[in-house]
Amino acid sequence: MRKYVIMGIQGSGKGTQAKMLAADLDLVHISVGDIFRWNVQNHTKLGAQVRRTMAAGELVGDDLVESVVRDRLTQHDWNFGFIIDGFPRDPRQAEFFLESYDIDGVIELDLPDSEVRRRVLNRRLCADCGMDYNLIANSPTVPGRCDMCGGELITREDDTEEALAVRLRDYHDQTNPVLEIFRRKEYVYTVDARPAPEVIQQQIRERLGLPPYQPENRGSEVA
């Protein structure tokens, strides 16, 4: 059983890398962001709370994140292990995670703030089906329209210069102490997040001592 944590600023591609690794190793991908987005799209009470927070350009509170993760891990559907992104968010949560789960490694995707801005401010989202696009790396065939359903592509509410500046500051303030705790245990494997996704995935596997990346092994979830 393998248990990994993947960490990286918004726009670093941690969701993509987590899905690629999970599909090939039969791991469960636990994404705090995906859980929140599902609740927003389905207009739940949690979703309304998350929407208000994101619209203000702020990060969702640590207590709420911890509650969501604890609930998800109690489902015990991760027979072969899991890879989690979006948690832990503070030193206390990191200590709890180390005590509760025998993790195998923490993957840190390193991306300069200037590249984060370039990527995030070019993101687009289908208003109908939620498909993600990036005008730099994954642009739609028809400008402004989703390839999957033809829906209108919009900018996320929190993808503004002002909101991004707040998220970058908060991320660094919160994440550095967490990484220091993991580094003391020699669990952190830092990977350059600037190359193409397949190159990053190969670097991750080399750092973790896993077999080479084989693109044909990817599941449909990653396509």
Regions found by a protein language model. Give the residues of each.
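Glycine-rich phosphate-binding loop of ATP-dependent small-molecule kinases
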Residues: 1-223
